[in-house]
């Protein structure tokens, strides 16, 4: 039986002195059903770290974007240039929405992604569904309390006015029976 392999390509910290760090998350997943990239960090750092580790991201079948904050989606333009085949699964609530943090001072969390390019590669999900071998959970019901760190996070409404982030842009993924999430802003107990 083939096992699931998980390799952190980008994070705030690392124990591997050969890898660089950034405020961002990117995880390479090698599962029985295929090769996946969960989030793309804030820059192209995940690509540089993958090269150091001998991981060929051109072979990835699906890129899974957990939510719209730039430390998870910021590297997507670099990934799309490197990998010509992978479908990108993300929330349909991400395009056109701006994100910000009020922690210490207001600063943007909006990723710089042109969704009009490579349109055929994006799979926008608004309802829980299956995409290939991936079970995608959207519109996560928030029955339990949300993480306290969310209180400083904002998103824009249709009029581009900021309001508390409702995290309708957050997705969770189940691949081969394993749950994957980014920050779990919706609360891990809710996911």
What are these regions (language model features)?
Residues 94-170:
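Metallo-beta-lactamase
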Residues 1-14, 151-159:
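Short Pro/Gly-enriched beta-strand edge/turn motifs at strand-loop
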Residues 1-3, 33, 59-60, 85:
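A general structural motif
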Residues 13-16, 45, 143-146, 186-187:
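Short, acidic Gly/Pro/Ser/Thr-rich loop/turn segments
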Residues 4-52, 165-181:
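Conserved beta-strand hairpin/beta-sheet module of binuclear metal-dependent hydrolase folds
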Residues 45-96:
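Active-site metal-binding motif and surrounding structural segment of the metallo-beta-lactamase
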Residues 69-72, 87, 166-191:
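Cap/insert and terminal regions of metallo-dependent hydrolase folds
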